[in-house]
């Protein structure tokens, strides 16, 4: 089964998510959601639709952001999704490989999704 890679840029008040395939194609417009249960449900609705259409399994990735990523991480792992938490230094180093130097929340989410797809399937659950 194929995978789709969901990169999430987490902050205190909002999150941006990018959903990409193995070829780094963005499958839907970036999703903006609040870091609460309603926001996570909004994200999962879109992810579920994409995965159903492509017959794929999602892999989620996010940076460790102190406490802000923890509720999203806890909910996704409780639902038995594969989730990779990156040290921000890893994502910073990965993003330096890009020619694009502008950094926005949407670009950060795309970078995390790309890092997931290059890395392959993480083993953490």
Residue ranges and their predicted role:
Residues 1-125:
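Phosphate- and other anionic-substrate recognition elements at nucleic-acid/protein interfaces
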